[in-house]
């Protein structure tokens, strides 16, 4: 199984300079990058189509020259009512185009979630997602990009604090059901291991539920309470079960890390990343 890393994991040390991130990935021996377009410092929405194409084609060519490819991107996400706006829809369409310019196969997308204590029913939320993604399908087909719905959580205020709230799409059977309802060869799933652990779901079982619709991964550990984005074996996830699950469904994608910087010290963090990938290599042998 190939390994990769999210550009978000490197962004604090390179001021989100995508070319420097490629150099870092090469030094780490990583051959795949998950480009975080939701946090990009390049304004791909408000430049011309030609300019955006030139930028991401140049980035792709630089990556290829260094033995690296962009296996997936991450689209922007927002809250209600922003995701009902034409502006947000156009941003996602532009993200699909930029994903294509990078020659990346997949774009990770957060399902749309209505706010806590709203008057919306779950069925309305499901239909909202179906309608939104159906509007995207012509663009996904035109640019040959596959959308991967990620298992997510949301937030709510409790006793003056913002705390994690599990939602419909925190649970594997619900996410798979949504994908089945859309029923398109261009729509699949991204498994976020930390989010699944927060939902107290068995990740092996989740992988089996996702099965052939599991196309991309966000790999990180946690203790099941906070979204720690920690390296493997530093939380409570059973990584051998994760490996076995991926093998059992014949997963051939990228084992892509999405871990937070562990220190503000640049050299220390790069050393920590090297150690993180040693753990990955040991697991996947």
Model-inferred region functions:
Residues 56-58, 62-66, 81-188, 198:
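Active-site acidic/histidine proton-transfer and metal-coordination neighborhood
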Residues 1-31, 64, 89, 97, ...:
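Histidine-acidic metal/acid-base catalytic patches
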Residues 31-32, 69, 105, 146, ...:
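Residue-level detector of anion-binding/catalytic polar loops
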């Amino acid at each position: 199984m190939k390994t990769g890393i999210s550009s978000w994991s490197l962004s604090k040390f390179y001021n989100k300079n995508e070319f420097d991130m490629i150099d870092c990935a090469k030094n780490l021996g990583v051959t795949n990058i998950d480009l975080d377009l939701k946090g990009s410092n390049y304004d791909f929405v408000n430049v011309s189509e030609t300019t955006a194409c030139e930028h991401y084609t140049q980035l792709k060519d630089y990556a290829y020259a260094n033995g690296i490819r962009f296996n997936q991107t991450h689209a922007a996400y927002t809250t209600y009512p922003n995701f009902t706006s034409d502006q947000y829809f156009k941003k996602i369409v532009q993200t699909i185009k930029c994903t294509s310019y990078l020659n990346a196969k997949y774009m990770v997308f957060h399902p749309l979630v209505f706010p806590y204590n709203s008057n919306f029913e779950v069925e309305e939320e499901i239909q909202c997602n179906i309608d939104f993604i159906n509007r995207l399908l012509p663009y996904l087909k035109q640019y040959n990009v596959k959308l991967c719905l990620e298992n997510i959580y949301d937030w709510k205020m409790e006793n003056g604090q913002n705390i994690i709230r599990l939602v419909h799409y925190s649970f594997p059977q619900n996410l798979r059901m949504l994908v089945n309802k859309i029923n398109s060869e261009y729509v699949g799933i991204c498994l976020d291991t930390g989010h699944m652990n927060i939902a107290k779901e068995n990740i092996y079982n989740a992988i089996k539920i996702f099965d052939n619709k599991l196309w991309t991964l966000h790999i990180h550990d946690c203790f099941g309470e906070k979204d720690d984005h920690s390296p493997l074996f530093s939380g409570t996830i059973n990584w051998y079960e994760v490996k076995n699950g991926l093998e059992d469904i014949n997963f051939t994608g990228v084992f892509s890390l999405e871990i937070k910087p562990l220190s503000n010290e640049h050299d220390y963090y790069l050393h920590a990343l090297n150690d993180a990938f040693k753990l990955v290599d040991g697991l996947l042998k």
